[in-house]
């Protein structure tokens, strides 16, 4: 925002309604009321126009701005003077240019504008100024003070800047006329009665009429400065005063009297608003005022002429003068009160807003400038830092490299020495061990005690040697143990001998014998000097330089000689060897010499020989070098000089390669060392963190145990003792309903209540002392109990009627502790609770009283719903708490909840909250507000809704105070990061209850999400706790490790206060058993081909490596591969359906639009036409062109019909009868069994009609065609009527021999080929050949409607079609159905001959065989056998699938087998689910119920079925467990058998193995059992993607991969991570799990608008599997073949499937 005014120069709001002066020029428009624009800090405006909407109303002027109007000094100018008292004295001129961009000169220079009285800026008027000439009696505003202009004026009168909020500029207003005082005064009578000023053309300036001269005014300049007006005064309009103030210097002359003749004629006046508008819009002339030019001079302005007005009559003038006098004498109104205070306040608000916007914009620009400056400064510093680094590197790099190289060389030498020393010591240990064993063996065999003691001493000596050597190997420098030192003999004469130190070993005899060596020891410096000299000599030999031999008189030799002499002189004289005559000494002596002769002498000999050969080889090399050096001067030729450059280059290349290789090796070694250091540091840190986590875990578990101790113990039934339930015995205290004073107080804590620790960082978990941790845990537990009680009290305290009720019946202010509570079943509950359900009710009631939330985790089918309903009934019946209760359940169970509550507790009203947004809005009208008490007469008590709707309408649910919130299937909130979990956690409810049959589904984190939800104060921020559970328990299930029993016990102690779980087999004895069976199936030939082709197209090793890198695209590809393999296992038709085959049809086919508008029955016309058509003229097809059809143009046809068919027709009945009577031509009819009427009718029928009539007549002489020799000949002959023997027609009916008879052996003998064809079943097999093409018959084409109608009547003749195909018409079928008639009498055999092939019928269209459809899948073939057995046994089946596409295929199979079924999946509507389940439960004829595991596995009761079949198992075993418990639940009296179809040797076996591991996790955590019976030696949890890749491999490949991974681990590498490159550094996005891909659209069973899953979309593999499997797949990346590789853009489902199926890259 720039501080320029928001209005354009021509805005009418910038002008007063009654101007005081006229502008001096068209291009310079000054406005007397512009001081309000000075409130914004002036800045350079942008060059664009403002919005047109910023224009103000033209009818009202606005109050001046109270804000200061000063400009900041430019270029160090002086600050502006203080604000003056009259705000209207400061003006701001606007430029008339479009986008003025002028520089700002110094604003306070006096040379820019003159301050004389002629300047228009020196006119002083108020915000509602009046003309300068007026009556004395009128009120007037205070005079203006002359002020200096604040803005410089440009050459055209515009200021030096323009507003960024201006509109498009327009020409300035023309100069205005100066009228008479009465004409200019809006309140004067003349102004009221005068007509509107006539408008002139834009170019001509109007002038005053001559009869009205302009009044002369004298303006006296005011004093130059006045005191500034306070801000409070400037904020209000100036006060109204009557008369002129005493300080006014303005002198106004009285107007001259106006003659009556000069007055205008009285005419009809317009309205006040119109007059005011006209007065504002009309140009007015004024006196010639000076106009400032470009150089500051002033030019007078000429007054323009105006047209003369009409004069009034004398009578009119007298009337006007009289009225004027009355008006002048009347009381004047307060003209200074404009009545626009609201506009003024609005303007003030807008001005402040503009100032704030300007400040905000300036702040943004200031931040941007500061940011740019800091960026530039940072770049400068960075450049200087880099330069300094380069200078330092250039100065010190060489020395550092040399130092590092020298250090590395020295370290390598020391390492080699250490290794040699280590090997020698290990060899010594091994030899001494052998000696020790040998000595012990001899000692055991020795009979003499002395000899045995000798051997034992040798063994002891060897043992000491071994210990000392091992100590040296381990680098231990501690002194020998006291037991290893030989004890000193006591000195009886005076203590012990003190000349030997106990901590020092005795000197060796062998060493003392060698003490007299002639060779002196060399110091380390001497050895290094000799090495340096040797290296220098070798370097000189290599460079062909003379050896730097020491001179003969070298002082070093003299020094060495002196040192040797001094050493010899210092050697002590050896003492004479004393001889010993003992036998042991002699044996040791002889043994020493034998060892020397056998070992040391050959060793020394070898050393000497090797030294001699080395010396000779060195001398030989030296001689060769010397001879070469001596011959060099002879071999120097021109050729050798030319080769110098080549040799130098080769040498340089070799040196470069050597140093590169050397640097690479050094770098690798350095990296390896750094890696080892980092790993060791990580290991140490991991150990420290493990100890810390252990203490933190101990703290958290202790805290929860204390909480459990404080709130009491959970109720436990007698039948649950054997189930391993975590419940313990309760206390003896019970709740006594009706006694308000009965309370049970908790014991006081020994810890300080005020020491609650909410931040774990404040606790020192590294300290060894755990006293502080125990105290903090106890304090936190007690605070948690206290907070739960206070929260319950606070909730009850807000309900005033409820509090009064509590005082009479039950005191909720002092909740009791948890114990054995004997609560009877509520009377309003119509059902009878079982024993364990009643105990569950007791537990839930006590949780409610304590204000504690809980998890009811009974196994599915034990009645969690009825227990929850009984709690609500108990609260309503005993404590008169009628709600509101909130029940949230999956969408598929909403109707079940509504029905159960209405059925079991009719007194409780249920509000079903679901439907569209409009319906839910209507339902919310029934909600009571939060402060209204719910009673029995309330609109509703329980609201039932779904998880999805709760999230959508969470803002409405959060406004209601819920007494009890029940979450059914609580695993829906297992993720603490989901919006569903967060929204539900924010609901205002007294208690929460979670119902779930599977508290643990995939990992322990989901259990902790539920614990967080029910107790957020106790289980807050326990990430380490959750990680501990996931790491220890799941690794226990995977690696078969031993879980700490104490930790498991304490885990169960944590779950005890919050979770109650019972198992069916312990609490429900009458419930039938559940038997699970795994049915293994084999792959068929087609499935094996698909499976092998898929596996050959992918490399398992590449998948493992990509999985190790962690690329998101590769992980998605891997998941897609798993899906394709599972499709192959289910059915190969999921990839490619068998196609319907037919010959190529050559013809035209009609096209139609969508069939959606057609309704149920679609009338398909015969529209197929041949490409060849025979065109006929319209004349031939019409009646006029037909000879036999009568018409207006065909008289011959009428003649024929009249004479040939009637008058001259011989087949008339009269003629036939006369002929028969006279034995004429028709006398044969008596031998043809034909009457006269039949002969007449047949004469008028065609061939087809006569054939149809003969179809129903039986041949009574057919038995005469065959000779029978059995006993029935007599009966047969009797069946033939005597008069039929003379029937000449039937007797002479000649026909083929094969058609003589239709039954018996004769028929078989006459039709051998046909009978054989039928008996062999050749007519029911698929035809092996079919024609390549077919075409409809050639038709006649005519453009007339008559021909088309006849063609349609012929083709679609109902009677003809019925006779040929024996298909009744639609009307006949409808009548048969309506009247419920037997269709047999109305259906005759067709007249068409029987087709040769029953499969092909009369066409050559081949439909895929359903038998082959069944046998193509191993699973489906096994299922077919299983269903046949189950159907015969009277069982009913629940059939679960993972893919909705497979359900579609299964529907075709069940239709083929004529099994009645019903279907429920994710696409089934909510209202249809209830009806489908009810049909299956009530109709026993329905054999199979097809369900998807996710949609049909929750909340529905299907106890009518006793068999569950999983066609393909889910990834999560809990989902399958929930699905099978749809049948195995309360109400099931039969044994439930569960069949699981698993394809042997495929990915499904490994998926099942993984599911067993998850089940083991649940069993360990919930029941506390130990792992066993299942092999959990699988891969680690961190490599989940690698595990999935391992599923695709067979056993041999898996073994090979594990072996390679083990080898890589031994080398210290990560298997498959070497080829990762930069991909390893990429962060993974949100994982697209296999569950999401499989159950897309159907997994969310509470989603009403779920669509069928698209994961099982069939993929065309006609081209995929035709490619040879050995074709290598081109790899992606640079330098890896010609394959482009797929891009990293987001791919569609089709592209991903193509990429998986091997269609190559996705080249466009």
UniProtKB/Swiss-Prot annotation:
Task: List the molecular function annotations (GO) for this entry.
Answer: ATP binding; ATP hydrolysis activity; ATP-dependent chromatin remodeler activity; DNA binding; histone binding
Instruction: Enumerate the catalysed reactions.
Output: ATP + H2O = ADP + phosphate + H(+)
Keywords on this record? Activator, ATP-binding, Coiled coil, DNA damage, DNA repair, DNA-binding, Hydrolase, Nucleotide-binding, Nucleus, Transcription, Transcription regulation
Instruction: Write out the GO cellular component annotations.
Output: chromosome, centromeric region; chromosome, telomeric region; Ino80 complex
Q: Where is the composition biased (Polar residues)?
A: 24-37, 87-102, 111-129, 1658-1672
Looking at the record, the residues that make up the DBINO domain are 592-717
Q: Please identify the protein, giving its name as recorded.
A: Chromatin-remodeling ATPase INO80
According to its UniProt entry, the function of this protein is described as: ATPase component of the INO80 complex which remodels chromatin by shifting nucleosomes and is involved in DNA repair.
What organism does the UniProt record list as the source?
Neosartorya fischeri (strain ATCC 1020 / DSM 3700 / CBS 544.65 / FGSC A1164 / JCM 1740 / NRRL 181 / WB 181)
Self-association or partners: how does it assemble? Component of the INO80 chromatin-remodeling complex.
| Low complexity biased stretches | 206-219
- This enzyme's EC code(s): 3.6.4.-, 3.6.4.12
One GO BP annotation of this record? transcription by RNA polymerase II
The secretion signal range is: none
Q: Which CDD domains match?
A: DEXQc_INO80 (cd18002), SF2_C_SNF (cd18793)
| Residues in Helicase ATP-binding domain copies | 845-1017
In what ranges is there compositional bias, type Basic and acidic residues?
A: 265-285, 426-463, 523-534, 551-571, 632-646, 1692-1701
List the gene name.
ino80
- Alphabetical list of InterPro entries matching this protein: DBINO (IPR020838), DEXQc_INO80 (IPR031047), Helicase_ATP-bd (IPR014001), Helicase_C-like (IPR001650), INO80/SWR1_helicase (IPR050520), P-loop_NTPase (IPR027417), SNF2-like_sf (IPR038718), SNF2/RAD54-like_C (IPR049730)
């Amino acid at each position: 925002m720039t501080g320029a005014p928001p209005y354009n120069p021509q805005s009418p709001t910038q002008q007063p309604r009654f101007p005081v002066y006229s502008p001096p020029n068209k291009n310079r428009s000054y406005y007397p009321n512009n001081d309000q624009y000075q409130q914004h800090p002036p800045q350079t405006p942008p060059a664009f126009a403002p919005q047109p909407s910023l224009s103000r109303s033209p009818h009202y002027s606005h109050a001046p701005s109270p804000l200061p109007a000063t400009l900041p000094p430019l270029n160090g100018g002086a600050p502006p003077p203080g604000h003056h008292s009259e705000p209207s004295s400061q003006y701001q001129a606007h430029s008339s240019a479009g986008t003025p961009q002028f520089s700002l000169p110094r604003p306070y220079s006096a040379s820019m504008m003159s301050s004389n009285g002629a300047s228009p800026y020196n006119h002083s008027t108020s915000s509602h100024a009046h003309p300068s000439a007026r009556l004395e009696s009128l009120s007037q505003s205070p005079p203006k003070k002359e002020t200096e202009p604040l803005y410089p004026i440009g050459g055209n009168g515009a200021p030096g800047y323009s507003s960024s909020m201006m509109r498009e500029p327009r020409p300035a207003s023309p100069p205005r006329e100066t009228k008479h005082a009465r004409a200019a005064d809006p309140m004067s009578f003349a102004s009221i009665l005068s007509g509107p000023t006539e408008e002139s053309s834009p170019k001509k300036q109007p002038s005053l009429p001559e009869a009205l001269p302009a009044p002369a005014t004298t303006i006296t300049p005011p004093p130059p400065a006045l005191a500034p007006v306070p801000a409070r005064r400037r904020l209000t309009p100036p006060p109204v005063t009557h008369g002129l103030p005493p300080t006014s210097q303005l002198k106004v002359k009285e107007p001259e009297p106006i003659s009556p003749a000069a007055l205008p004629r009285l005419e009809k006046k317009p309205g006040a608003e119109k007059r005011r508008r006209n007065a504002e819009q009309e140009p007015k002339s004024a006196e010639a005022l000076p106009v400032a030019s470009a150089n500051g001079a002033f030019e007078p302005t000429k007054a323009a002429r105006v047209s003369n007005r009409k004069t009034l009559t004398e009578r009119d003038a007298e009337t006007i003068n009289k009225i004027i006098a009355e008006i002048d004498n009347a009381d004047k109104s307060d003209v200074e009160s404009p009545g626009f205070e609201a506009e003024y306040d609005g303007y003030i608000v807008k001005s402040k807003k503009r100032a704030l916007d300007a400040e905000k914009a300036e702040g943004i620009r200031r931040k941007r400038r500061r940011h740019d400056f800091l960026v530039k400064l940072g770049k400068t510093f960075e450049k200087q830092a880099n330069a300094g680094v380069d200078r330092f590197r250039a100065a010190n790099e060489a020395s550092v490299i040399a130092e590092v190289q020298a250090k590395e060389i020295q370290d390598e030498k020391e390492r080699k020495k250490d290794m040699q020393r280590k090997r020698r010591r290990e060899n010594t240990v091994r030899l001494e061990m052998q000696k020790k064993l040998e000595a012990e063996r001899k000692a055991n065999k020795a009979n003499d005690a002395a000899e045995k003691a000798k051997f034992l001493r040798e063994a002891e000596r060897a043992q000491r040697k071994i210990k000392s050597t091992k100590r040296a190997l381990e680098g231990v420098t501690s002194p020998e143990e006291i037991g290893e030192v030989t004890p000193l003999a006591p000195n009886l004469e005076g203590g012990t001998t003190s000349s030997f130190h106990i901590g020092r070993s005795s000197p060796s005899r062998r060493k003392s014998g060698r003490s007299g060596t002639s060779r002196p020891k060399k110091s380390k410096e001497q050895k290094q000097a000799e090495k340096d000299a040797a290296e220098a000599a070798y370097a000189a030999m290599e460079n062909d330089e003379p050896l730097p031999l020491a001179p003969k008189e070298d002082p070093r030799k003299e020094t060495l000689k002196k040192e040797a002499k001094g050493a010899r002189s210092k050697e002590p004289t050896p003492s004479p060897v004393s001889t010993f005559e003992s036998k042991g000494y002699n044996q040791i002596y002889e043994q020493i010499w034998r060892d020397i002769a056998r070992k040391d002498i050959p060793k020394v000999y070898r050393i000497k020989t090797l030294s001699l050969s080395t010396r000779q080889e060195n001398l030989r090399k030296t001689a060769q070098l010397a001879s070469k050096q001596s011959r060099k001067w002879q071999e120097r030729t021109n050729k050798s000089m030319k080769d110098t450059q080549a040799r130098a280059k080769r040498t340089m290349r070799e040196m470069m390669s050597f140093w590169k290789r050397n640097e690479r090796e050094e770098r690798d070694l350095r990296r390896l060392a750094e890696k080892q250091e980092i790993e060791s540091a990580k290991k140490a840190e991991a150990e420290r963190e493990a100890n810390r986590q252990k203490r933190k875990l101990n703290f958290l578990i202790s805290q929860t145990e204390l909480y459990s101790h404080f709130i009491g113990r959970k109720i436990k039934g007698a039948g649950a003792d054997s189930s391993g339930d975590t419940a313990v015995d309760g206390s003896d205290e019970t709740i006594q309903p009706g006694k308000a004073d009965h309370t049970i107080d908790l014991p006081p804590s020994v810890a300080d209540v005020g020491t609650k620790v909410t931040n774990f960082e404040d606790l020192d978990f590294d300290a060894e002392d755990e006293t502080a941790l125990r105290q903090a845990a106890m304090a936190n537990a007690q605070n948690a109990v206290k907070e739960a009680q206070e929260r319950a009290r606070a909730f009850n305290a807000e309900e005033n009627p409820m509090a009064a009720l509590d005082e009479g019946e039950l005191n909720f202010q002092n909740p009791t502790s948890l114990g054995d509570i004997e609560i009877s079943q509520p009377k309003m509950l119509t059902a009878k609770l079982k024993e364990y359900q009643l105990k569950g009710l007791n537990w839930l009631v006590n949780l409610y009283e304590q204000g504690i939330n809980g998890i009811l985790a009974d196994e599915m089918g034990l009645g969690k719903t009825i227990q929850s309903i009984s709690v609500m009934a108990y609260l309503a019946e005993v404590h008169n708490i009628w709600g509101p209760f909130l029940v949230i359940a999956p969408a598929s169970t909403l109707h079940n909840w509504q029905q159960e509550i209405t059925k079991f507790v009719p007194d409780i009203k249920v509000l079903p909250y679901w439907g569209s947004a409009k319906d839910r809005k209507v339902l919310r009208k029934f909600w009571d507000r939060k402060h209204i008490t719910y009673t029995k007469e309330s609109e509703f008590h329980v609201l039932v809704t779904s998880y999805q709707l709760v999230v959508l309408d969470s803002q409405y649910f959060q406004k209601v105070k819920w007494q009890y919130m029940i979450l059914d299937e609580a695993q829906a909130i297992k993720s603490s990061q989901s919006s569903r979990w967060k929204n539900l956690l924010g609901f205002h409810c007294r208690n929460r209850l979670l119902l779930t049959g599977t508290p643990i589904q995939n990992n322990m984190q989901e259990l902790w999400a539920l614990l967080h939800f029910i107790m957020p104060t106790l289980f807050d921020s326990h990430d380490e706790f959750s990680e501990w559970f996931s790491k220890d328990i799941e690794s226990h299930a995977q690696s078969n490790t031993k879980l700490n029993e104490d930790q498991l016990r304490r885990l169960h102690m944590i779950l005890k206060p919050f979770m109650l779980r019972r198992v069916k087999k312990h609490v429900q004895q009458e419930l039938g058993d559940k038997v699970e069976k795994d049915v293994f199936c084999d792959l068929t030939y087609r499935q094996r081909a698909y499976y092998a082709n898929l596996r050959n197209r992918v490399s398992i090793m590449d998948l493992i490596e990509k999985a190790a890198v962690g690329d998101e695209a590769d992980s998605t590809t891997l998941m897609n591969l798993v899906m394709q393999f599972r499709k192959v296992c289910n059915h190969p038709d999921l990839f490619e359906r068998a196609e319907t085959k037919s010959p190529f049809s050559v013809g035209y086919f009609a096209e139609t639009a969508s069939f959606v508008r057609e309704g149920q029955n679609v009338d398909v016309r015969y529209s197929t036409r041949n490409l060849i058509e025979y065109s006929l003229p319209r004349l031939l097809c019409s009646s006029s062109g037909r000879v036999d059809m009568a018409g207006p143009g065909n008289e011959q046809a009428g003649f024929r019909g009249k004479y040939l068919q009637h008058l001259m027709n011989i087949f008339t009945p009269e003629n036939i009868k006369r002929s028969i009577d006279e034995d004429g031509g028709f006398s044969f009819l008596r031998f043809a069994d034909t009457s006269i009427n039949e002969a007449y009718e047949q004469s008028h029928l065609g061939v087809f009609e006569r054939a149809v009539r003969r179809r129903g007549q039986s041949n009574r002489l057919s038995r005469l065609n065959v000779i029978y020799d059995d006993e029935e000949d007599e009966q047969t002959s009797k069946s033939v009527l005597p008069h039929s023997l003379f029937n000449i027609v039937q007797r002479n009916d000649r026909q083929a021999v094969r058609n003589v008879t239709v039954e018996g052996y004769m028929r078989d003998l006459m039709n051998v080929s046909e009978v054989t064809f039928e008996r062999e079943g050749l007519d029911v097999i698929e035809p092996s050949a079919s024609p390549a093409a077919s075409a409809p018959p050639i038709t006649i084409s005519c453009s007339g409607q008559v021909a088309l109608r006849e063609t349609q009547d012929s083709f679609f003749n109902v009677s003809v079609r019925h006779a040929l195909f024996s298909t009744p018409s639609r009307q006949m079928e409808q009548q048969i159905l309506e009247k419920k008639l037997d269709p047999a009498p109305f259906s005759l055999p067709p007249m068409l001959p029987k087709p040769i092939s029953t499969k092909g019928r009369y066409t050559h269209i081949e439909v895929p065989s359903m038998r082959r459809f069944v046998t193509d899948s191993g699973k489906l073939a096994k299922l077919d056998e299983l269903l046949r057995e189950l159907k015969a046994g009277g069982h009913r089946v629940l059939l679960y699938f993972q893919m909705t596409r497979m359900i579609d295929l299964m529907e075709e199979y069940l239709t083929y087998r004529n099994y009645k079924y019903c279907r429920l999946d994710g696409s089934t509507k909510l209202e249809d689910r209830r009806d489908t389940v009810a049909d299956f439960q009530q109709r026993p004829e329905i054999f199979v119920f097809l369900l998807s595991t996710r949609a049909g596995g929750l909340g529905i009761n299907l106890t009518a079925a006793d068999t569950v079949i999983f066609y393909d198992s889910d990834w999560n075993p809990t989902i399958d467990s929930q699905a099978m418990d749809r049948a195995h639940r309360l109400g099931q009296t039969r044994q439930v058998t569960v069949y699981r179809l698993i394809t042997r040797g495929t990915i499904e076996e490994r998926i099942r193995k993984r599911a067993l591991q998850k089940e083991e996790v649940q069993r360990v955590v919930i029941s506390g059992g130990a792992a066993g019976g299942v092999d959990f030696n699988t891969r680690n949890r961190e490599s989940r993607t690698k595990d999935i890749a391992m599923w695709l491999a067979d056993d041999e490949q898996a073994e090979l991969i594990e072996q390679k991974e083990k080898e890589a681990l031994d080398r210290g590498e990560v298997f498959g991570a070497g080829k990762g490159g930069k991909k390893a550094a990429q962060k993974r996005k949100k994982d697209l799990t296999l569950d999401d891909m499989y159950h897309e659209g159907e997994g969310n069973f509470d989603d009403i608008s779920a669509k069928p899953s698209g994961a099982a979309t069939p993929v065309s593999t006609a081209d995929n599997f035709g490619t040879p499997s050995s074709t290598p797949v081109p790899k992606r990346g640079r330098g890896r073949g010609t394959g482009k590789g797929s891009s990293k853009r987001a791919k569609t489902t089709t592209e991903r499937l193509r990429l998986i199926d091997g269609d190559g890259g996705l080249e466009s």
